[in-house]
Amino acid sequence: MADAAASPVGKRLLLLFADPTASASASAPTAAAVVSGDPGPALRTRAWRAGTVRAMSGAVPQDLAIFVEFDGCNWKQHSWVKVHAEDVLALLLEGSLVWAPRKDPVLLQGTRVPVAQWPALTFTPLVDKLGLGSVVPVEYLVDRELRFLSDANGMHLFQMGTDVQNQILLEHAALRETVNALISDQKLQEIFSRGPYSVQGHRVKVYQPEGEEVWLCGVVSRQDSVTRLMEVSITETGEVKSVDPRLTHVMLMDSSTPQSEGGTIKAVKSSKGKKKRESIEGRDGRRRKSASDSGCDPATKKLKGDRGEVDSNGSDGGEASRGPWKGGNASGEPGLEQRAKQPPSTFVPQINRNIRFATYTKENGRTLVVQDEPVGGDTPVPFTPYASATGQTPLAPEVGGAENKEAGKTLEQVSQGMVASAAVVTTASSTPTTVRISDTGLASGTGPEKQKGSWSQASGENSRNSSLASSGFGVSLSSLSQPLTFGSGRSQSNGVLATDNKPLGFSFSCSSASESQKDSDLSKNLFFQCMSQNVPSTNYLSRVSESVADDSSSRDSFTQSLESLTSGLCKGRSVLGADTQPGPKAGSSVDRKVPAESMPTLTPAFPRSLLNTRTPENHENLFLQPPKLSREEPSNPFLAFVEKVEHSPFSSFVSQASGSSSSATSVTSKATASWPESHSSAESAPLAKKKPLFITTDSSKLVSGVLGSALSTGSPSLSAVGNGRSSSPTNSLTQPIEMPTLSSSPTEERPTVGPGQQDNPLLKTFSTVFGRHSGSFLSAPAEFAQENKAPFEAVKRFSLDERSLACRQDSDSSTNSDLSDLSDSEEQLQAKSGLKGIPEHLMGKLGPNGERSAELLLGKGKGKQAPKGRPRTAPLKVGQSVLKDVSKVRKLKQSGEPFLQDGSCINVAPHLHKCRECRLERYRKFKEQEQDDSTVACRFFHFRRLVFTRKGVLRVEGFLSPQQSDPDAMNLWIPSSSLAEGIDLETSKYILANVGDQFCQLVMSEKEAMMMVEPHQKVAWKRAVRGVREMCDVCETTLFNIHWVCRKCGFGVCLDCYRLRKSRPRSETEEMGDEEVFSWLKCAKGQSHEPENLMPTQIIPGTALYNIGDMVHAARGKWGIKANCPCISRQSKSVLRPAVTNGISQLPSVTPSASSGNETTFSSGGGAAAVTNPEPDQVPKGAGTDGRSEEPLKAEGSASNSNSELKAIRPPCPDTAPPSSALHWLADLATQKAKEETKDAGSLRSVLNKESHSPFGLDSFNSTAKVSPLTPKLFNSLLLGPTASNSKTEGSSLRDLLHSGPGKLPQTPLDTGIPFPPVFSSSSAVAKSKASLPDFLDHIIASVVENKKTSDPSKRSCNLTDTQKEVKEMAMGLNVLDPHTSHSWLCDGRLLCLHDPSNKNNWKIFRECWKQGQPVLVSGVHKKLKSELWKPEAFSQEFGDQDVDLVNCRNCAIISDVKVRDFWDGFEIICKRLRSEDGQPMVLKLKDWPPGEDFRDMMPTRFEDLMENLPLPEYTKRDGRLNLASRLPSYFVRPDLGPKMYNAYGLITAEDRRVGTTNLHLDVSDAVNVMVYVGIPVGEGAHDEEVLKTIDEGDADEVTKQRIHDGKEKPGALWHIYAAKDAEKIRELLRKVGEEQGQENPPDHDPIHDQSWYLDQILRKRLFEEYGVQGWAIVQFLGDAVFIPAGAPHQVHNLYSCIKVAEDFVSPEHVKHCFRLTQEFRHLSNTHTNHEDKLQVKNIIYHAVKDAVGTLKAHESKLARS
């Protein structure tokens, strides 16, 4: 819930309803009047209604309503007011108490008292359809005179300590009483709603909105210290009512005034009991719920659950709670100068110091913080203070910038009692997407009256919500799916600014009613609403104080100048031109208007000619060219809005410059002439290549802090242009501009490559594609070398040592202070920054893209970001921050150049938004970790750009973009020019053949992700950080590339979680609350993270991923490697594919779009020219024996989701059956159906350019499935393919099914009742609701082609026997493969057993069985090991004193804190074993020992002994050539692949046969498990007979039994392993059995992953009879190594005491299962050990394919010779 300050209950309210008789534009004159400088009369004459909020209701913004008791009305006339009703024009909520200037005398007791200042209440707009802008509504006390002041000058916060003694108060008792009453009421509301107080036992009266009596009197019998809910015993009736003081007005009836300590009301500290803390610690912070989550209504519950996230004690500034101003007091705050002079009335943000947090560190290194019971229940709540809904209030830092903050500080100091007076005193829990209609200074006057369906309407709505949120309507806001926070809105929104023609300065209705609006669909986009506030004029206080020209004429001239400059845009030109060419260039659009927002605030020194600007219109989205976005929209300031040029989607982008970016030299009309200078599409690519973006040049050559002649001439340089910089970034990202950043991260080690790396042709190829990475990277452009005289050295990291106090007092950067921590958004921050300090002589050369160019020039360069999933390796050393060097800091301040954040948020700037990791640092239990470690863990490390304002205050400037990469960053992601180690030509082919399809699906998934990026959004680039694994904060899957990040806290979500949340209706999301499986963490102050507010971010720089995809297709075509990838642009089918001979007519299904023989881009995207592939691939014609003809390598603009698979055109086989074939018509029907549907799929470009097309509505066909265009794919359906077990399960057409013949059609888990899958079933497990042709045909074909499932077990058994015979014959045939490999066959010929673990040729025969998904046994490994190392006595002697946990295998009970010696001593001696309560010796197993990844460190000798002697080293060794995990560069966190030990006693008795040592489960990776020791226990009789019986009942085969009798070998454990494809059937059986036993089946649990089942003989029999599933029963003897395929369910039953050691690996054959399982594991609860994705399968696949492609490319000469 919300605190007092956040809740509107009990506050004064001003309402203005629409006059039904007035015209729609009636309010326009009001706005105009406001702009003209005298807002008072125009606004005062409206029919304002004042009253007090007595109650509120509504769980979602649309339903939010308040009960208002209007002044001067009787009780019957009081009513509920729907906050967002159409007739509500303005809703203003009480803010702070201030001293406001007053001209008219006050009438007191019949006498007129002239006063200069008078106490007044400020009001903050929650709903503002009038466009109040910077107007400050105030209501003077006593006479309640309402005034609208044009600015906050002359106002200052009422100080309780000193102002109570003010002469005016002492002289006028009525005023004094009014002030005291007001303060008292505010104190009471705070007491009721928050703080270390309890009103238990006090008499109160509760308001009854709709009761017969207005007030009910009673006594508080109980008040919850956390939720603040109180139980009131009603005096009259005696009933007990539960009252929430934040929703219903409660007043204290006691005469005494509550006091904080020792008064009538005592502070109550909440318990700090260990038990409470432990119970909370045990849960994942993300799933946490507050103590009282149950038992209250959903809205309350949600709010409580959302209570602040971690950072509620705001140490470094404002993180915990906002002062009233911050929240949104519209009341004026002193002007800049005034405030600077003001005494320490500056706010000190309220800090909730009473919140306690329990922390614990997870295995991945991430610290989770769980909010424990706050002391006294002083919890921050989601009610956000409201960051002024209309940017007018300095309170909204976003609006007022630092000044606001400072102002806020001033205000907040008020008195303890006044804490609650500000509507925003509380933490800003507002959601990040707050949007408001009128931003500071450019409040769009366009009210709803102007455009119902467009911008203003949307903004209006948002401004309402946001204001609500901030003002404290937070009640339901935190749970709203709608973003509500004001300042925060910006930073969370991506994309184009709302460019309504809005006014400059603080004008309000700047755009004339007649001006055309944007497309109405844009108005619905929250992003645009947010961006509408993203204006440069960030501080209306400073504007006012600087006498900002606010007359309408200036506005008109502004718009005119904007229009006149539309010709300035020239596409495709490099930003740095050689000379100025006057006149517009071709490609400019003359009729375009540039929004006023793109301009900084006008000040007298800011000539209007500076307004001649263009806003960027180009898109950076790799695949989306904005369908027909209104071209007026400027781009997201965070990342340049770029346009694609020629090749790469991310290559030379050009953003238009905005006026503010031009320097003083371009102030005149000459500015336009300079624009084209650097824009010529013909030159853009070459220039991009010639001029480096990252330059580690001599300090003397870098941009200097010298301000150009602008200063001397009196015209402002950019640094002096208002407070804000143009909100629209300009300048092509490809600009080779010198960056004051390092070319490589301080912690980054360059990838290990051969000596030829610098001349890497691949790198050059990529450079060409990206338009940047060329050899000239290290040379700076000549003009730069000449122009930049002042020295500047590369920046690294930053500390606060040299920071002056001014940074806290400086109003220009209030956005950076704590107060703005949540209410301010990055966009606004950027808008405020302006391009400070750029020499004017440089700006003249920056052209129309000046601002963007300047940004790059100033250092928006590469860098790395510290990721999310904090698992990391050994601490890394980070170089000294640049800010440790005073001279560098001075130069940075002079030049205003942006630089990368090179330290943790805490060390760099505590007053800026802190990332999640840095927020948690202060709560970590173990502070002794190295500072460098926490620095690298910072999520903004080398990701966020910072800049000093002209006042020397640090603020956020933006984030890196994908184009701002350097060769070192790119080298990590592209093939090395030299041969990769450990991979040869044949291995490369094999890897590509097995992994190429998965890689292609991965690329398709990334394209799908890019299509989800809105056209207006900009993609950021988060550089990989050495030793840190990027993880999704929701499902803990490793982030591969595209993901979404919160700009404020670094919260990141993967594609799947993002899509899942975005596709779900908001109402459903709110209802789910914390109980959903994938619940999202809150932002800094408990604000909800809304998908639309997150910033799309990629990890792989540039277009490397898509180019590797092209290379994969090219390589497979050139080398004749089989391919079955689903993308339409894939190469020809494998030459190995046999011709179909089943008699069905062979009709090619090549689509017209694929008919071109030329290769087109694999990654072609929306409107971009195709990326030129390094080498066009030529598929050899006639290759192979099937006579296939050449197939186009790629299809132009192939649909990203892939159309139906292209089939190679082959001539009909000689034995083709006649057309009269019984199935001929079915086959042709299916083919025709596929062709028709394929036609509709269209190319990627056409699909993406459909303006109305939803990101989910791509009509596409997977090679294996048709995805319903209306069904959002909840998970990586393209990635995973249609089934869990077989990527080829579903045919690309009915024809494939018909060709399969009886007995060949696999069964999918989705359709277990049908012998084969539906022809075009959806790849997501969506219930088929409509009968369709494929469904209908299923039944026909089932009867014609395939035998129905046999229900008769005897028949099934017979069928299986035949199948087994076939398998056995096939297996035996493998003997021919390598007669020299000693092996045998177990399990009736289904299990390969290799006898010589050291045979170098084992891998050949092993691979044939392994690729079939079969387990393999290798015997005799123990003969190679040093047996003395693996004996129980050795372990007991070396590690006996360690404390461990044991598990009782019989009942799964855990025995904690036992010495490991106790376990080992009873390993073979039963009498020494620990005993249970009934006195029986327990069957124990060691739990996680050695712990985690400690095996190698704890037992180095054993580690070496094991790794040297593992069989099949090609697969099992860490650097094995077929172990794909070895391809992952050391730069990344290596997956934990073991070894792990499994030590347990044997289960000997008959009763034990029903339990397992290790229950049924499966692993995401392949594994080899070696039995290194078998201990046969002594004492209490022999157990050999029982063991033999267990083996016999375990279905072991005769050959296995002979090993016991004839070979005298020691049996250790009985395994049951099942094929990965049978996992779903096993689940089905276990669910069925569970239901029979009355067990529940929660959604985040899985019968296999839960490891709660052991399949005993009865269950195994049922599985076989009911589902036809038969596994492998394997007895593992001493020295046997069992190879378990990834995804294969298996269980273990120890026959005797065993020591087993397992090592994991990733084989090419089973990568598809790794893919699928990673998705499965996402759905598990956090308690599952497999929940977290440690394998990083996508990264492994990427780098394996990258190395394979590089190797093949290096061997192409051989191909040419052959």
Curated annotation (Swiss-Prot):
A motif (LXXLL motif) lies at residues 1294-1298. A zinc finger (C6-type) spans 1032-1057. Residues 299-310 have a biased composition (Basic and acidic residues). The modification N-acetylalanine is found at residue 2. Residues 253-350, 426-468, 574-613, 713-763, 806-853, 1146-1217, 1285-1306 are annotated as: Disordered. Its EC number is 1.14.11.65. The modification Phosphoserine is found at residues 493, 547, 557, 561, 767, 774, 779, 799, 1254, 1260. Residues 426-435 have a biased composition (Low complexity). One of its GO terms (cellular component) is nucleoplasm. SMART domains: JmjC. The modification Phosphothreonine is found at residue 615. Residues 453-465, 713-746, 1146-1163 have a biased composition (Polar residues). Residues 1499-1722 form the JmjC domain. Binds 1 Fe(2+) ion per subunit. One of its GO terms (molecular function) is zinc ion binding. Its cofactor is Fe(2+). There is a cross-link at residue 789 (Glycyl lysine isopeptide (Lys-Gly) (interchain with G-Cter in SUMO2)). Fe cation binds at residues 1561, 1563, 1690. It catalyses: N(6),N(6)-dimethyl-L-lysyl(9)-[histone H3] + 2 2-oxoglutarate + 2 O2 = L-lysyl(9)-[histone H3] + 2 formaldehyde + 2 succinate + 2 CO2. It is found in: Nucleus. Its main location: nucleus. The keyword Acetylation applies. PANTHER family: JMJC DOMAIN-CONTAINING HISTONE DEMETHYLATION PROTEIN, LYSINE-SPECIFIC DEMETHYLASE 3B. Leu-Xaa-Xaa-Leu-Leu (LXXLL) motifs are known to mediate the association with nuclear receptors. Histone demethylase that specifically demethylates 'Lys-9' of histone H3, thereby playing a central role in histone code. Demethylation of Lys residue generates formaldehyde and succinate May have tumor suppressor activity. This is Lysine-specific demethylase 3B. It comes from Mus musculus.
